[in-house]
């Protein structure tokens, strides 16, 4: 069977931990979109592993696959694999030959384009890792794919075609002399070719490349379980998110089919688990109607003074939850749980169950709020508008719940062990979304998650 893990919010919901939690019955774990811009943290036996490209299941000895929907920076991939090996692990990672490759010029252009956008206050808040420019080349039919790295002649043809275009973009559009760059070789045909060729040689030496769709179909035919792992979250999906403050791919469940080579019916007949953080976080610009205080340079109109109580609450949640970007280290904007956002995510993905993380972070507060609806143009709405401009005009309406105390979270083994007010909060969310809760996270380690149901249960 297949189980698809999808972030229901804006990323950073704790998907890696849930993949790890439910990973035992899975034989193969597949990343179906994104690149090394999406950090995820896995804790195994008290040891923390921070990864941005290698699938989470690799920490537990599962076969990891980077699907054709991913964009792959081989340098990052090799660095993470070598790091895991240095720590005594033996990751088995396969890379789709149809996946596109992030090359040095992509990273340079990503930073330049974001800087240009910032001058017009339209910066998206990218990580500068070349993700967007690589997907642009994919759509523009000028990309270099993993399979191209394995054929010297094809690779040379691809590089000779695309690199002069990138150099012209740099010099003629952005007005930057290539020799003024820290890495001018990023726009040199021979240098790019040699770098890419070295990537291909190592991929071939370690027998890492596969036709992902065929590979996964064969695994399923042999009776193996496949878990599909999305990066980021539904609300930054390029089609279903708050455009233009989105990523360049589809983290939603539909992307699991196109990004892996498995049929939509295969994905749809399996379980689709939505990962929810018990509060809301965001890195970068864009609407956040339930936001507490703000982050300068990210929250529109925020000047660093939202009032002592709200600032204190936002800082408390941010610090208790470690809400700083895994890749960038940037502070995340924080807010109360947003049900209009989750209703949209539930509809788009067809969640069969929810895993709610970080319930422990909210412990000790006198009250906990949930944004249950918005007011827009004098009317109450229950889901997010289709345009970002309208979403930015929404004012959140809140339901208030009594807070729950700090407890010994290590002693919370069953759902009934959770504080009563926390259960009330969770049951409200489940009822509003008409979706069962499969798991509740009360800490970072796998054994700090209360499992109500496994998606692999009959």
Predicted regions and their residues:
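Non-transmembrane, aqueous-exposed alpha-helical and coiled segments at domain scale
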Residues: 1-458
